[in-house]
């Protein structure tokens, strides 16, 4: 198995992504099951998927639990729904998909775990010279800063599963620039003012922030 998946005797898996979206795919159905939801997706690489395989959905690592020739299904639990925007999905929604990295592949984005930290709200979209500039605001306080839930100028951040470079970094907001290819091949083409997105902050920054607490 060439997937960058490490299995222990307890069958606990650790997956890694790069924030390079393979496809913006369509939600076929969303089924409520107590506190969980079952999301059925249609995508071009469904025949390559296997049961128990991990796929990032808007940056959230989910496990394939069933599949057909044309669709596959994943389950999002209550904690995931509370922390991400997956609870907003409905039939026809477009979702950014990325399978876990291959050990012999390039790391074209940055290290992404598929563990969303929190959501943010788009507060501005500006088109300029063929590119788009998106501004996002998120909840921020001292405790979050100590956990590494912050951005730095020219650092990396994962927005809806897309690896991006930060500009105009502030305590509770940041901006990213989107090129036409990314705009057209991810669900950034549907993001507008008021849209809720998923954030995963840089894992390197999280570890540095934690180590600084012991200085």
Model-derived segments and spans:
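Conserved loop->alpha-helix
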Residues: 15-215
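Short, Lys/Arg-enriched N-terminal segments with co-localized hydrophobic residues
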Residues: 1-15
């Amino acid at each position: 198995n060439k997937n960058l998946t490490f299995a222990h005797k307890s069958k606990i898996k650790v997956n890694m992504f790069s924030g390079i979206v393979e496809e913006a795919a369509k939600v076929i159905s969303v089924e409520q099951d107590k506190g969980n939801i079952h999301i059925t997706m249609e995508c071009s690489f469904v025949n390559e998927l296997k049961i128990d395989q991990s796929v990032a959905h808007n940056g959230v690592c989910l496990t394939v639990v069933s599949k057909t020739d044309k669709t596959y299904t994943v389950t999002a639990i209550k904690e995931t729904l509370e922390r991400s925007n997956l609870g907003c999905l409905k039939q026809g929604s477009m979702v950014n998909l990325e399978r876990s990295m291959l050990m012999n592949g390039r790391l074209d984005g940055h290290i992404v775990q598929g563990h969303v930290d929190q959501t943010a709200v788009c507060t501005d979209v500006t088109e300029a010279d063929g590119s788009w500039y998106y501004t996002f605001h998120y909840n921020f306080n001292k405790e979050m800063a100590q956990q590494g839930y912050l951005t730095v100028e020219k650092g990396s951040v994962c927005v809806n599963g897309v690896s991006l470079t930060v500009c105009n970094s502030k305590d509770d907001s940041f901006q990213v620039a989107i090129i036409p290819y990314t705009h057209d091949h991810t669900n950034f083409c549907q993001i507008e003012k008021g849209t809720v997105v998923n954030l995963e902050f840089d894992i390197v920054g999280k570890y540095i922030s934690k180590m600084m607490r012991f200085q």
